[in-house]
């Protein structure tokens, strides 16, 4: 099986050693699923927004990339049981004057292209301008360079950046619920495979493997 994943979105996807080794919660979870499927899995890393055409055009068999189940995505693809609840989080630089959701009024917000976060920003009706970035590194750079006033990203990713660079960033407000959880995405004709994956996810939860993997990252 060829598994499509995101180029870089810690703690879900992390490249290390000159991009030769890939790890992270999504990767470890998928490798365990592959082991239980008795399948050989190869990971292909894409810019997040390119994962959708890659799956549609069958360059990959499955996608795991902190992929949120949304109504829009369900029109085109099928999803496994969610393996984690999905939340978003606003983040800004430590010296920013933005401290609350109200302070976000009329501000420029950076989001990763292909995520449901642009829609979430605009639905808050704060007259925001959304700036799209292909890579999370570029989005954080845009934040540092004042191209944007704040960014909206996966809650776990925001917590990761806060922990790794506490003197650079701060969180704005609490996490916000979005979608129906993080899930493994497939083309509709792969429903038999998704059923097998669902069974494995439940087994992993029951035998403690899921909690062990989760505890390594969160």
Protein language model regions, located:
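A conserved helix-loop-strand patch within extracytoplasmic ligand-binding domains
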Residues: 39, 43, 47, 68-69, ...
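Short, well-ordered beta-strand segments
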Residues: 2-5, 91, 108-111, 151, ...
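A ligand-binding cleft/hinge motif common to bilobed small-molecule-binding domains
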Residues: 50-53, 65-75, 120-123, 137, ...
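Extracytoplasmic small-molecule ligand-binding "clamshell" domains
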Residues: 1-66, 75, 132
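Ligand-binding clefts/hinges and TM-proximal coupling segments of bilobed small-molecule sensing domains
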Residues: 116-133, 169-175, 201-218
């Amino acid at each position: 099986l060829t598994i499509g994943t995101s180029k870089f979105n810690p703690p879900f996807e992390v490249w290390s050693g000159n991009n030769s080794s890939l790890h992270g919660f999504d990767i470890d979870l998928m490798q365990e699923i592959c082991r239980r499927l008795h399948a050989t899995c190869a990971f292909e890393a894409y810019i997040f927004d390119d994962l959708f055409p890659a799956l549609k055009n069958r360059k990959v068999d499955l996608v795991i990339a902190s992929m949120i189940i949304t109504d829009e995505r369900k029109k085109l693809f099928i999803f496994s049981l969610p393996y984690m609840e999905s939340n978003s989080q606003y983040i800004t630089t430590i010296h920013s004057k933005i401290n609350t959701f109200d302070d976000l009024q009329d501000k420029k917000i950076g989001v990763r292209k292909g995520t449901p976060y642009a829609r979430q920003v605009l639905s808050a009706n704060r007259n925001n301008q959304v700036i799209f970035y292909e890579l999370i590194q570029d989005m954080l750079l845009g934040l540092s360079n004042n191209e944007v006033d704040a960014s909206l990203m996966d809650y776990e990713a925001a917590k990761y950046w806060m922990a790794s660079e506490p003197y650079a960033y701060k969180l704005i407000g609490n996490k916000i619920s979005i979608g129906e959880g993080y899930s493994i995405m497939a083309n509709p004709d792969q429903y038999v495979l998704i059923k097998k994956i669902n069974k494995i996810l439940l087994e992993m939860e029951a035998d403690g493997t899921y909690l062990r993997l989760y505890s390594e990252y969160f």
